[in-house]
A protein has these predicted regions:
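A helix-coil-helix interface module used to build multimeric assemblies
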Residues: 1-189, 195-196, 201-208, 217, ...
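Conserved beta-strand/loop scaffold segments within soluble protein domains that form the structured core
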Residues: 162, 206-226, 233, 237-240
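Generic, well-ordered alpha-helical scaffold segments in large soluble proteins
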Residues: 34-38, 84, 88, 131, ...
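Glycine-rich anion/phosphate-binding loop at the beta-strand->alpha-helix junction
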Residues: 172, 176, 190, 223-317
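A glycine-biased, small/acidic residue-tolerant capping/turn segment at secondary-structure junctions
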Residues: 47-50, 261-266, 337-348
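Alpha-helical coiled-coil oligomerization motifs
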Residues: 133, 137-140, 181-184, 252, ...
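Long, amphipathic alpha-helical stalk/connector segments used for oligomerization, subunit docking
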Residues: 295-348
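Short amphipathic alpha-helical segments with heptad-repeat character
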Residues: 115-122, 126, 133, 163-166, ...
């Protein structure tokens, strides 16, 4: 039974795959596999044992169903994953999860999810920037009334209005490119972040794992990745969604019957504006995306709360982050895509 609106109404399938249970499971296996690979690179695990781990550390062998069965007994998700891997690995199972702590796996897998999400968000933003640039060029000589305080001011062009939107969106692209190396980061220094379980080569092991996975290497961590990184990510999404909402709110206002200077496209042969008032042509996509932008911003506050952990870690962040990172990511992409759709079909 579908419960969350993301299940059936909002968000693209690519984001749902990244943040789904299967997406999480696949990336955690990838991280566990990279751990054993790094040990093998350092001469701690034989090539034969790594070959076994490489073969079994895939979702078709260590299934999500089997991990869930074990978790029902252990009540610990990563211990369940470790047991399922060791079970499948046979004699090579000794090197599964070697020297790691749970959050080495969890936070590094989240780093992979963030990395993959940033790729999709950047693509959606670049698409919107291109559409906005087309509007600015097309309407560069379209004179319209400028307004301040909601009152008539002096003339501007619609092209200037779109150019202002474009410049703001370009700044978001710069911010994302600057922030990405700080956001897509893992950690592998074990319990409380000392690396003691890995011995003298702990930092080299961490570097090998994270570079192999395409993630940034932190200078220092506790038992978890610093949540300031996640705050920056969610803030970027909230800021970007706000810029989209500003564009959409302007279009909604210009589509008012008493203004009627610009508005969403409307398929007069198929689309229905109202079940009662046949003349209605409502800016429904702009309204839809504006509402979603509010939800994206709502995840900023819990992201800050999640950063306040006891000592070297606690688990109060975990349940909240299953919502904040996944939902904000999927909805931000939805807002970007719908804003581009509105601009493509807009009449002026």
């Amino acid at each position: 039974m579908a419960f969350c609106p993301l299940d059936y109404r909002y968000g693209c399938q690519d984001f749902k795959r990244i943040w789904s249970e299967d997406g999480r499971h696949e990336r955690q296996l990838e991280v566990e596999r990279a751990l054993v690979w790094a040990h093998q690179q350092m001469g701690r695990v034989s090539a034969e044992d790594y070959a076994v781990i490489e073969k079994i550390a895939v979702p078709d062998v260590v299934t999500k169903q089997r991990v869930s069965e074990i978790e029902a007994e252990t009540r610990h998700d990563i211990m369940a994953l470790t047991k399922a891997m060791a079970e499948a690995a046979g004699d090579a199972g000794w090197c599964v999860h070697l020297g790691a702590t749970s959050n080495d796996i969890v936070d590094t897998a989240v780093g992979l999810q963030l990395r993959d999400s940033i790729v999709l968000l950047r693509k959606a933003l670049c698409d919107l920037i291109a559409v906005c640039a087309d509007v600015a060029e097309r309407e560069r000589d379209t004179v319209m009334l400028g307004r301040t305080h909601g009152q008539a001011a002096v003339p501007i062009t619609f092209g200037l209005k779109a150019a202002v939107w474009l410049d703001e969106l370009r700044r978001h692209l710069v911010r994302l490119d600057e922030a990405s190396p700080r956001i897509a980061v893992g950690k592998f220094l074990g319990a409380v972040g000392t690396g003691a379980a890995q011995g003298e080569g702990a930092r080299e092991l961490q570097r090998l794992i994270l570079e192999h996975l395409g993630l940034g290497v932190p200078l220092a961590t506790t038992q978890v990745v610093g949540r300031d990184r996640y705050i920056e990510y969610v803030h970027w999404m909230g800021n970007t969604a706000t810029s989209c909402q500003k564009v959409l709110t302007e279009i909604r206002n210009l589509q008012r019957s008493e203004i009627a200077e610009a508005g969403e496209g409307f398929d007069v042969k198929k689309q229905v504006g109202s079940s009662t008032m046949a003349h209605k042509k409502n800016p429904i996509t702009s309204e839809n995306a504006s509402g979603l932008a509010r939800i994206v911003r709502s995840f900023i506050a819990p992201s800050h709360e999640n950063a306040i952990l006891w000592h070297e870690r606690d688990l109060a962040n975990s349940s909240a982050e299953r919502f904040t990172l996944s939902h904000a990511s999927a909805l931000c992409e939805d807002v970007l895509a719908k804003t581009a759709k509105v601009l493509r079909g807009m009449w002026v």
